[in-house]
Amino acid sequence: MKNLKKQRRIQVIALATVALVLSTALIGYAMRDGINFFRAPTQILAEPPAPTEVFRIGGLVEEGSIVRGQGETIRFSVTDGNGVVPVTYTGVLPDLFEENQGMVGTGSYINGVFEASEILAKHDETYMPAEVVDMLKEQGVYKGTEG
């Protein structure tokens, strides 16, 4: 009787371990496309990512760089005060998108141009990663809501 209880306990523990490993693997597999790493323009220029890598870029929209193309295609540049990366985006831009304002874009860096699939724009640091906000404030370039 004791051996039967011990064997049953071992089976339950083994089954629970297998279920835990399997669920962890499934969660990791499901999240692989949802994880986007953030980079500043200076980092992108120093070490260009592979064209297949999807990541986020953040900084300020460079003054005088917005060029509207045919249809919904927009070209502009993003800067962190040290580096400047050209960006193309096809779609409708957020209402708060304008020159000298913060933005974060999701996309890929292909042939020296960041091709954005999504653009977020905000007048304060809500969508801006802390590293970029600090870098821009250090250089006196950032114009946030704190005055």
UniProtKB/Swiss-Prot annotation:
Membrane-crossing residue ranges in chain numbering: 10-30
Entry superkingdom: Bacteria
GO terms for cellular component: plasma membrane
Periplasmic compartment segments: 31-147
A Gene Ontology molecular function term of the record: metal ion binding
Statement: the UniProt record of this protein carries the keyword Metal-binding: yes
InterPro entries referenced in this protein's UniProt entry, alphabetically: CcmE (IPR004329), CcmE-like_sf (IPR036127), NA-bd_OB-fold (IPR012340)
Binding-site positions, heme: H123, Y127
A UniProt-annotated Pfam family: CcmE
One GO-annotated biological process of the protein: cytochrome complex assembly
Gene3D superfamilies found in the cross-reference section: Nucleic acid-binding proteins
Keywords: Cell inner membrane, Cell membrane, Cytochrome c-type biogenesis, Heme, Iron, Membrane, Metal-binding, Signal-anchor, Transmembrane, Transmembrane helix
Mode of membrane association: Single-pass type II membrane protein
Disulfide bonds: none
Tagged with keyword Cell inner membrane: yes
Entry's localization field: Cell inner membrane
Topology, Cytoplasmic side: 1-9
PANTHER family per the UniProt record, alphabetical: CYTOCHROME C-TYPE BIOGENESIS PROTEIN CCME HOMOLOG, MITOCHONDRIAL
Family: Belongs to the CcmE/CycJ family.
Record's function text: Heme chaperone required for the biogenesis of c-type cytochromes. Transiently binds heme delivered by CcmC and transfers the heme to apo-cytochromes in a process facilitated by CcmF and CcmH.
Official protein name in the record: Cytochrome c-type biogenesis protein CcmE
Organism: Roseobacter denitrificans (strain ATCC 33942 / OCh 114)
Chain's gene name: ccmE
